[in-house]
From Swiss-Prot:
Notes concerning its domains: The C2H2 domain is the main region responsible for the transcriprional repression.
InterPro entries named in the record: KRAB, KRAB_dom_sf, Krueppel_C2H2_ZnFinger, Znf_C2H2_sf, Znf_C2H2_type
Listed GO CC annotations: cytoplasm; nucleus
Biased composition (Polar residues): 132-151
Organism: Macaca fascicularis
The protein's name: Zinc finger protein 425
Molecular function terms from GO: DNA binding; zinc ion binding
Basic and acidic residues bias spans: 153-168
Pfam families from the UniProt entry: KRAB (PF01352), zf-C2H2 (PF00096)
Zn finger region (C2H2-type): 179-201, 235-257, 263-285, 291-313, 319-341, 347-369, 375-397, 403-425, 431-453, 459-481, 487-509, 515-537, 543-565, 571-593, 599-621, 627-649, 655-677, 683-705, 711-733
Region listing for Disordered, in residue ranges: 67-86, 128-169
Physiological role: Acts as a transcriptional repressor.
Length: 741
C-alpha cells in the first residue's frame, strides 16, 4: 500500500520533545545514507531547516506521495534526481525520499527501473505511475498521524495501512486499527473502549487539545458547558429540593419518588425503574454470565461486576476517603463511609425513629417491625431477615469454616469470630468504657456495660414490668410467662419456643435407632454415637491433651479443654464482666442474672437453671445410678461424682490451697477452705444476719427459724433439721436391733 507520513502545524505541537528529536535524527540518518550511496541530488530543504533551527512541519496544502519499494541501490544512470522542491516522505522501509525522486522519472529511466524489479512489482509500478503524479489525494486518519492514499485506486480507498516497524526509525503501529487517546497516548483496539476511557479525563484536560475542540462533540460539549456555567440549576425536585441543569435529569430522578416501575420482567413479574436494569435482569433468566474471573472461575452478568470482583484477588482499593485516608474496594462503600463523617442520616424509620444513611438499609431495618423474613434455609426451614445471616447459617449445616487464623491456623465460621480471636493473640481490647476504662472485644458488649453505669434498662417486660438492659435478656425472661404458649413434644414432654424446632426434634422420635448399648440398653441412630457412648462405661479416653497429658472421651471435650491453656475466653458477660471459653457457658451464666430456670421436672414441677441439673434430678425419681465405682461398688447419678469418689481410693488431691498448701480432692472443698483465710462468709441469713461458708449450711439454719424438720426417721417417725442428725439417729436403731433379738 502507498503511505505518506507528514506532520501538520497542529500535530507538530502535540508531539513530545523526544518524538521531535527522534524525527530529526531519522531525517539526518536517511539523508546521510542516500549521500553515502552516491545519489546525485541537492540538499533537501528539510535538512536545511534543521540546520537553521526552523520549525519542522509541513503545511496541509503540501502533497506527499509514497515511493516505490527499494530493491537495490540504484546507479546514477538509473536515477536522475532533480533538485526541485524536495518534500519528505517515507517508503515502507522508512527511507527518506522526495516527491521528484519517485514521481518524475524520465522515459528511459522508467524502463530501466521497471527492468530492475520482479514481474509482480513491475506490474504494480506501471499501474501507479500516473497515481504518483496525480494531485488528487484522499486523507484518512490513524492515531495521531495522517496517511495519504491514492483516490485513483478504488480497491484501496478505505484501506488503512500501517508499515512494519523498523529498528531505530519512527514506529508506526501495525496490525488491526488502533484508537489512541490524545491526552495520555493510551491505545485501544475498540473505539467504544476509547470513548469510555476519555470519560476518565476531566473536561478541562480535554479542552486543552485542539483536536478535541475541532470535533463536533467537543464543540457541542463546549457550548453546553458554557451554557450551563452561565445559568443556574433551574430544574428542582419538589420532593427533596435537589436541583439539575437539564429537565431530562430531573425526570429520571423523580422516578425514585413516584415509585413508578414501568418495565416489568416477563419471566418473574419483577418490575424496574429503568430499561437498562431490566436488560441486566433478563440475563439472569437466560443464564447469561459472559464475564468470567480467570482466578476463581466465577461468572458475572456485567463487566463492572467482574471489575469489582477482581479487586478481591488483587487487593486493590482505589477509592480513598478524603477525611481519614481510608481506602475502599467499591465506590458505594466509600459513600456509605463518608456519611459517618458528615453525620447525615436522611432516612428515618416511622416505627422507632431510627435513622439510616441509605434507603436500602432503612428497608432492611423495617423487616424487623413487619417480621418479614424472606430468606429461608432449605435444610431446617429457619428464616432470616438478612441474606448474609442465611449464608452464615448455611455454614452450620455444611461445616464450612472459611476464615482461618494466620497465627494458630484455627478456622472460624464467621469473619467477626476470627477478628475477635485475633485480638486474643494481640491482647487488644479496642472498645473501652469511658467511665471505668474497662476494655471489651465487642462494641455491643461495651454498650451493654455502659448501661450499668447509667442504670438504663430500656427493655421492659409486658407481663410483669421488669426491665432489662438487653433485648436478649428480655427474650429469656419472657419464656417464663410464655411457657403455656410453647410447643411441647408429645413423646417426651420436652417444650420448644418455635414450631420449626419442635419439627426438627420430632425426627429424633420418628427415626429408627438400630444401635443399642449392651450395658444400659440406650439406643442410637448412628454407630458413631454408640461408640462414643460406650466410652462412658469402659472409661476409655483416647484423646489426650498435648499440654498437660489429660485425657478425654470425646475430641470436642479435648478442644474445649485446650482453650484453658491458651487462656482463650472470648465470651464475656456484660453484667459482671466474667469471661468464658464457650458460648453455652455464657448462656448458662446469664441465667444467674435473669433468674431464668427453663428446665422443669415433670414429676414434681421443680425448675432448674441447667439441663444437667434436671437430668440428675430425674435420676432421683427413677432411682437410677448408672455410674458405679469398680473399687467399692458405690453408684452415682453423675459422672463427675464418680470421678470425685475415685480420688478417695487413689488418694489424689489435685486442688491445693496457695496459702497453707493444704490439698483437696474436690474443687468445691478448696473454695470453702479459701473462705477461712479470707474470713468471708458469702451466705448470710436474712433473719438474724449470721453468715455461713456453704449454701447447704444456710438452708439448714433457715429451718431453725421456720421450725421445719425435713429429715424424718422411717422407723419411729422422728424428724430432724439436719441430715447428719438423721444419720446419727438411724445408727441408734441399728445398734438396738441386735440386742432386741
Amino acid at each position: 500500500d502507498d503511505v505518506a507520513l507528514y506532520f501538520s502545524g497542529q500535530e507538530w505541537e502535540i508531539l513530545e520533545k523526544w518524538q521531535k528529536q527522534m524525527y530529526k535524527q531519522e531525517m539526518k540518518t536517511n539523508y546521510q545514507t542516500l549521500d553515502s550511496l552516491g545519489y546525485a541530488f541537492s540538499k533537501p530543504d528539510l535538512i536545511t531547516w534543521m540546520e537553521q533551527g526552523r520549525m519542522l512541519f509541513i503545511s496541509e496544502q503540501g502533497c506527499l506521495d509514497k515511493t516505490r519499494r527499494t530493491t537495490s541501490p540504484p546507479t546514477d544512470e538509473q536515477l536522475d534526481m532533480k533538485d526541485t522542491g524536495k518534500l519528505p516522505c517515507f517508503d515502507h522501509e522508512g527511507t527518506l525520499r522526495t516527491k521528484e525522486e519517485d514521481c518524475r522519472l524520465n522515459g528511459p529511466q522508467k524502463q530501466d527501473l521497471g527492468a530492475a524489479l520482479p514481474g509482480k512489482e513491475r506490474k504494480i509500478l506501471s499501474a501507479r505511475r500516473d497515481t504518483f503524479q496525480s494531485p488528487s489525494l484522499q486523507e484518512t486518519e490513524i492515531p495521531n498521524k495522517k496517511v495519504s492514499i491514492t483516490a485513483s485506486d478504488p480497491d484501496k480507498k478505505d484501506l488503512r495501512h500501517k508499515p512494519r516497524e523498523t529498528p531505530g526509525r519512527l514506529e508506526i503501529p501495525t496490525g488491526p486499527r488502533c484508537y489512541s487517546c490524545y491526552v495520555c497516548r493510551k491505545v485501544f483496539q475498540v473505539r467504544r473502549d476509547l470513548l469510555k476511557h476519555k470519560r476518565s479525563h476531566s473536561k478541562s484536560q480535554l479542552r486543552r487539545y485542539p483536536k478535541y475542540r475541532n470535533t463536533s462533540r467537543g464543540k457541542s460539549e463546549l457550548r453546553r458547558t458554557q451554557r450551563l456555567l452561565c445559568q443556574k440549576k433551574r430544574f428542582q425536585c419538589s420532593e427533596c429540593e435537589k436541583s439539575y441543569f437539564l429537565k431530562g435529569s430531573l425526570v429520571t430522578h423523580q422516578v425514585v419518588h413516584t415509585g413508578q416501575r414501568p418495565y416489568p420482567c416477563p419471566e418473574c413479574d419483577k418490575t424496574f425503574r429503568y430499561r437498562a436494569n431490566l436488560k441486566k435482569h433478563l440475563c439472569l433468566h437466560r443464564g447469561e454470565r459472559p464475564f468470567c474471573c480467570g482466578e476463581c472461575g466465577r461468572a458475572f452478568v456485567q463487566q463492572c461486576e467482574l471489575t469489582e470482583h477482581l479487586r478481591l484477588h488483587s487487593g486493590e482499593k482505589p477509592f480513598q476517603c478524603p477525611q481519614c485516608d481510608r481506602c475502599f474496594r467499591l465506590k458505594r462503600g466509600m459513600k456509605v463511609h463518608l456519611s459517618q463523617h458528615s453525620g447525615k442520616r436522611p432516612f428515618h424509620c416511622p416505627e422507632c425513629g431510627r435513622s439510616f444513611s441509605r434507603k436500602a438499609a432503612l428497608k432492611t431495618h423495617q423487616r424487623t417491625h413487619s417480621e418479614e423474613k424472606p430468606f429461608s434455609c432449605d435444610e431446617c426451614g429457619r428464616k432470616f431477615i438478612y441474606k448474609i445471616k442465611l449464608d452464615e447459617h448455611i455454614r452450620v449445616h455444611t461445616g464450612e469454616k472459611p476464615f482461618s487464623c494466620p497465627e494458630c491456623n484455627k478456622s472460624f465460621r464467621l469473619k467477626r469470630s476470627l477478628k475477635a480471636h485475633g485480638l486474643q493473640h494481640s491482647g487488644k481490647r479496642p472498645f473501652q468504657c469511658p467511665e471505668c476504662s474497662r476494655g471489651f472485644f465487642w462494641r455491643n458488649a461495651m454498650r451493654a456495660h455502659q448501661r450499668l453505669h447509667s442504670e438504663q434498662k430500656p427493655f421492659p417486660c409486658a407481663e410483669c414490668g421488669k426491665r432489662f438492659t438487653r433485648p436478649s435478656k428480655l427474650a429469656c425472661h419472657t419464656r417464663v410467662h410464655d411457657r403455656q404458649k410453647e410447643f411441647p413434644c408429645g413423646e417426651c414432654k420436652k417444650t420448644f419456643s418455635q414450631q420449626s424446632r419442635l419439627t426438627q426434634h420430632l425426627k429424633v422420635h420418628n427415626t429408627e435407632k438400630p444401635f443399642s448399648c449392651a450395658e444400659c440398653g440406650r439406643s442410637f441412630r448412628r454407630r458413631a454415637h454408640l461408640t462414643e457412648h460406650t466410652r462412658l462405661h469402659s472409661g476409655e479416653e483416647p484423646f489426650q491433651c498435648p499440654e498437660c497429658d489429660k485425657s478425654f472421651s470425646w475430641k470436642a471435650s479435648m478442644k474445649f479443654h485446650q482453650r484453658m491453656h491458651r487462656d482463650e475466653k472470648p465470651f464475656a458477660c456484660s453484667e459482671c464482666g466474667k469471661t468464658y471459653t464457650h458460648q453455652s457457658q455464657l448462656t448458662e451464666h446469664l441465667r444467674l442474672h435473669s433468674g431464668e430456670k427453663p428446665y422443669q421436672c415433670p414429676e414434681c414441677q421443680k425448675t432448674f437453671r441447667l439441663k444437667g441439673n434436671l437430668k440428675s434430678h430425674l435420676l432421683q425419681h427413677s432411682g437410677q445410678k448408672p455410674f458405679s465405682c469398680v473399687m467399692c461398688g458405690k453408684s452415682f447419678t453423675q459422672q463427675y461424682r464418680l470421678t470425685e469418689h475415685i480420688r478417695v481410693h487413689s488418694g489424689e488431691k489435685p486442688f491445693q490451697c496457695p496459702e497453707c498448701d493444704k490439698s483437696y480432692c474436690i474443687r468445691g472443698s478448696l473454695k470453702v477452705h479459701l473462705y477461712t483465710h479470707s474470713g468471708e462468709r458469702p451466705f448470710q441469713c436474712p433473719e438474724c444476719g449470721k453468715g455461713f461458708l456453704q449454701k447447704r449450711s444456710l438452708k439448714a439454719h433457715l429451718c431453725l427459724h421456720s421450725g421445719e424438720r425435713p429429715f424424718s426417721c422411717d422407723e419411729c417417725g422422728r424428724s430432724f433439721t439436719y441430715v447428719g442428725a438423721l444419720k446419727t439417729h438411724i445408727a441408734v436403731h441399728a445398734k438396738e436391733k441386735p440386742s432386741s433379738l
